[in-house]
Amino acid sequence: MRLFLVCLAALSVVACHAPSSRGAEGGSRAGGALRIATWNLEWLVAPEDFLALARSCVPEGASPGRRRRTIPCDVAAKLERSTADFDALARYARELDADVVALQEVDGPAAARRVFPGYRFCFSTAPAVQNLGFAVRDGLPFRCGRELADLSLGGRLRSGVELVLHPGTAAELRLLSVHLKSGCGRRTLDSPRDACGVLARQVPVLERWIDAQAAAGRPFAVLGDFNRELLRDAGPARNGSGGLRSLWSEIDDADPPEADLANAAEGERFVNCHPGQNFNGYIDHIVLSRGLAARRVPGSFRRVTFEPREALRRNLTDHCPVAVDLATHAGRDD
């Protein structure tokens, strides 16, 4: 089934406050900078929709049959979010204070609006519950771009979603939100693990999008849950037989020149979302084209973490956002 992008306006605005940024790197935003971020919100579904889905959840090992909008029964049992849970997530979103947020694992605008009031949205409208897209601060010029359906490998996985900021001006900027195959966080893509082979099939699709933007001379960024520790993804792109082995080396080839990429987290200290986690590397990334990397505000990378006691009491998410600031384009047409 073909998927379409929708742009929806947020319905309400709430007052903001600026709590301290526990564990976050970077300081306050430089004047006029654009803050872009990415956040996987782990099965974020509006409460009224969650209850309906929970009543017909799919047990472990069972098939959903022809149903496309389903949630697993373990998700139904553990991830029902209260008003207080949504309020806490919205508070962290205000702390993030991003102009644009690439979103993953969000059912759609009804759920996203509870975390990002005062934003507008571009979302894929897949019948599945785990969609992805963007939240865009109200007032920032944008249009919803095309969907990168080939990234779903025939509907098996998730498509990419494109966003165009300042369309038709000298400041036009392309962003792509992605959520790649899990299960191959560190292994080389030519390892025998099935997940690595699936991820390897997504890489050429991603590289084609990157190269198309680079060839057109456009600044761009890819943001999202790569499910891979790109900062440790070193070595040659291909093995001796020509098989793909490194995602990062394959896409960061400077061919065309704008495809000389930078990871916003490079050189930054890794911080878990809360003390109960024991991960040791980023899998949520902001990948910048050469032109955008030159506009990165030094020291602006930040990771908004959760207050430890709140992380234990609330249904938040197993990911927390990362962000970086970009200096205003000199040729910007406001």
Predicted regions and their residues:
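Metal-dependent phosphoester/phosphodiester hydrolase catalytic core
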Residues: 168-176, 180-204
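Bacterial N-terminal signal peptides
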Residues: 4-15
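Stable alpha-helical elements in mature extracytoplasmic
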Residues: 85-89, 102, 108-111, 131, ...
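Active-site beta-strand/loop signature of hydrolases that rely on acidic residues for catalysis
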Residues: 36-41, 71-82, 89-112, 163, ...
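Second-shell loop/turn segments in exported
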Residues: 73-80, 92, 97-103, 150-151, ...
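N-terminal, active-site-proximal structural segment of metallo-dependent hydrolase catalytic domains
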Residues: 16-116, 127, 310, 330-334
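Metal-dependent phosphoester-hydrolase catalytic domains
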Residues: 16-26, 207-221, 227-334
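Structured beta-strand-rich core segments of catalytic domains in phosphoester-bond hydrolases
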Residues: 100-181
